[in-house]
């Protein structure tokens, strides 16, 4: 956060002022700015992941001012970027923070600490697999002649049709494969032969292979199980999984730092004991 926030702000300012290229796209009457990034959705994803990390750091200490700043981000996204997935995910994150803030306040009045119910814990554990299975299966078996699939494909900006094409051309490999992709990012010129796997689940499964896909899903489960009584971590992981249905940033560690959580130590006392081993006595 110490490094990423200043760099992101500097990139935004440089892009907006013209010091570096600011790619500007149009969707209907809406203007979509990338603010120095390769594409508006990439810029928004970086901001969403940073805010999610900030929420995880602050947790119950998140103030109403901070929540207000998150709302301003949603308005900013809508006005300058038109990034529907990131906007929806940000709104969901805000609602989760407000809900947890209220639940913690009510629990404190009773002299206790809020812990999620067993049902909520189970739901959080199931959601990543449900979302992954839904996106993979609807892409693999997409049929434009089925009305609900056709409408869903339109809602998902043709992600199902492109996923179907990817499965037909490459299919699943154990250790992954090279899949050349052509996206809209990096240029405002019309792209010929657009082919980009936006969904993280389909992207990881086809490009990195079944083994890596299973390992990543297990890592998500490990993070949740290890922090099963930490509602903020559960909420953030679920939100990242929802975001990954439509966007491809799940396995980009410069964006999704949460995948490193299984290797992190959160216990202050444990860390202090570990440091004691390496202290040099005079």
Labelled PLM ranges:
Residues 57-68, 111-119, 221-236:
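Membrane-interface helix-loop-helix junctions at transmembrane boundaries of multi-pass membrane enzymes
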Residues 207-241, 266-270, 274:
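Hydrophobic transmembrane alpha-helices and their immediate junctions
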Residues 6-17, 72-80, 128-136, 237-249:
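Aromatic-anchored segments of alpha-helical transmembrane domains
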Residues 148-208:
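Long extracytoplasmic/lumenal interhelical loops at the membrane interface
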Residues 81, 98-150:
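A membrane-periplasm/extracellular boundary helix in multi-pass inner-membrane enzymes
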Residues 7-59, 81-85, 197-204:
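Membrane-interface segments at transmembrane-helix junctions in multi-pass inner-membrane proteins
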Residues 40-41, 66-105, 205-210, 246-253:
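Helix-loop-helix junctions and helix-breaking kinks within/between transmembrane helices
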